[in-house]
């Protein structure tokens, strides 16, 4: 799961609200071990890892007695911090995916640009799917973009909220897998000569 000459990043974050450990192998095979205390969120992160072919470990403990906001937010922050460690030379940089799931379809486009921006149109019709507050899905992606210094655009259509959310996380994984692919021809993919703030 983790070994060899691979791009592996590890983040730990502890606050009064949460305690998060996250480890991701960008060059993995889609193995995962996830426990956030929010089973449907675990399912979404597993879908991201599996379809992006990332090996992912997430151990999170948060103030779920209040609600799930801080846990979802801080996992997003940790994933963003991990992704921000990716060497920007010799990667594809851009990634995109259109993923259907029954009635739902999600489109994701990302740019590992060194600039954070998140634009999404996920508008849930239900307050919860399982034990996850659906409003926190948008906040998760905002947190990833902000701390990962990447640009994320996403659109979701469909009827079933489970399908919409799962298609979105699958599409994010597939798009990120493409963006992080090694391509020795590319060097730094910017007319500025660098990808950072």
From Swiss-Prot:
The keyword Metal-binding does not apply. GO terms for cellular component: cytoplasm. It is found in: Cytoplasm. InterPro entries: IGPD_sf, ImidazoleglycerolP_deHydtase, ImidazoleglycerP_deHydtase_CS, Ribosomal_Su5_D2-typ_SF. Pathway: Amino-acid biosynthesis; L-histidine biosynthesis; L-histidine from 5-phospho-alpha-D-ribose 1-diphosphate: step 6/9. GO terms for molecular function: imidazoleglycerol-phosphate dehydratase activity. The keyword Lyase applies. Its EC number is 4.2.1.19. It is an enzyme of class 4 (lyase). Gene3D superfamilies: Imidazole glycerol phosphate dehydratase, domain 1. Keywords: Amino-acid biosynthesis, Cytoplasm, Histidine biosynthesis, Lyase. Pfam families: IGPD (PF00475). Its main location: cytoplasm. Belongs to the imidazoleglycerol-phosphate dehydratase family. PANTHER family: IMIDAZOLEGLYCEROL-PHOSPHATE DEHYDRATASE (PTHR23133:SF2), IMIDAZOLEGLYCEROL-PHOSPHATE DEHYDRATASE HIS7 (PTHR23133). This is Imidazoleglycerol-phosphate dehydratase. The gene is hisB.
């Amino acid at each position: 799961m983790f070994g060899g000459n691979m791009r592996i990043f590890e983040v730990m974050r502890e606050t009064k609200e949460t305690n998060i450990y996250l480890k991701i192998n960008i060059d993995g095979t889609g193995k995962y071990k996830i426990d956030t205390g929010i089973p449907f969120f675990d399912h979404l992160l597993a879908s991201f890892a599996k379809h992006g072919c990332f090996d992912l470990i997430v151990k999170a403990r948060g103030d779920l007695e209040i609600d799930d906001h801080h846990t979802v937010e801080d996992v997003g922050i940790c994933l963003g911090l991990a992704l921000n460690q990716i060497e920007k030379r010799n990667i594809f940089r851009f990634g995109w995916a259109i993923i259907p799931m029954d009635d739902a379809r999600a489109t994701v486009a990302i740019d590992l640009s060194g600039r954070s921006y998140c634009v999404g149109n996920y508008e849930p019709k239900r307050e919860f799917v399982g034990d996850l507050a659906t409003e926190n899905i948008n906040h998760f992606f905002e947190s990833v973009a902000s701390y990962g210094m990447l640009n994320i655009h996403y659109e979701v259509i469909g009827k079933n909220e489970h399908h919409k959310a799962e298609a979105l996380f699958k599409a994010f994984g597939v798009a990120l897998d493409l963006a992080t692919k090694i391509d020795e021809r590319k060097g730094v993919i910017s007319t500025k000569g660098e990808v950072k703030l």
